[in-house]
């Protein structure tokens, strides 16, 4: 779902393109939610060898209902006509990523690797674990996120949910104005931690 959301010289490589054998043994399952901003519409597609595709169709047909017709048409239109829109969105996300990365890494105790794709960063905030604020200890990413939500009114996601207990997931999908405001609030909240 992130194959179109790559920055700079980074390229998405589908495993099926590596060799004929890989092609014959690869199942691609993809969705429209990220690259085409169709989150919540729950529409996607699969590509696989014919025998597997028939099995997938049978499973899907017995576990979920079909997507609403207008959503199916919207997905087709997105795949056929939205390359320029996606390219614009990627450029905007790159600007927001760069700004968010620079702001986060300038904050006391936060380290972060930059990313070549997607629309979120996963900074390491473990510097704050074991520290206290308002009489409460920050023990983990859940406590850290709760504090930031309560104090700064900024929603971030515990990294533990992504097998990264030292980190938090920070999305940069909002407008630049909102990102600036959120990071300003977050920085002020971090300054209060002892």
Placement of each model-derived feature along the sequence:
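PLP-dependent class I/II
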Residues: 1-194
């Amino acid at each position: 779902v992130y194959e179109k959301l790559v920055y700079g010289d980074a390229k998405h490589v589908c495993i099926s393109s590596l060799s004929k054998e890989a092609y014959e043994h690869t199942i691609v399952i993809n969705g429209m939610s990220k690259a085409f901003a169709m989150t919540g519409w729950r529409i996607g597609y699969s590509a696989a060898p014919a025998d597997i595709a028939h099995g997938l169709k049978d499973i899907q047909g017995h576990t979920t209902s079909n997507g609403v017709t207008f959503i199916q048409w919207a997905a087709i239109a997105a795949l056929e006509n939205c390359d320029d829109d996606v390219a614009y969105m990627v450029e905007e996300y790159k600007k927001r990523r760069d700004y968010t990365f620079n702001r986060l890494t300038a904050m006391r105790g936060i380290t972060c690797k930059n990313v070549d794709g997607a629309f979120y960063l996963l900074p390491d905030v473990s510097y704050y674990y074991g520290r206290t604020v308002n009489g409460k200890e920050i023990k983990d990413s859940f406590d850290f996120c709760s504090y930031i939500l309560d104090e700064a009114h900024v929603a971030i996601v515990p990294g533990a949910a992504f097998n990264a207990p030292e980190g938090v997931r920070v999305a940069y999908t909002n407008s630049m104005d909102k990102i600036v405001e959120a990071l300003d609030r977050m920085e002020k909240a971090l300054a209060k931690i002892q």
